[in-house]
Swiss-Prot record:
The modification Sulfotyrosine is found at residue 3. Disulfide bonds: none annotated. The modification Phenylalanine amide is found at residue 9. Belongs to the gastrin/cholecystokinin family. The modification Pyrrolidone carboxylic acid is found at residue 1. PROSITE patterns: GASTRIN (PS00259). Expressed by the skin dorsal glands. It is found in: Secreted. Coiled coil: none annotated. This is Phyllocaerulein. GO terms for biological process: defense response; regulation of blood pressure.
């Protein structure tokens, strides 16, 4: 999972 700065669903 890449970090988007928000919750990864």
């Amino acid at each position: 999972q890449e970090y988007t700065g928000w919750m990864d669903f």
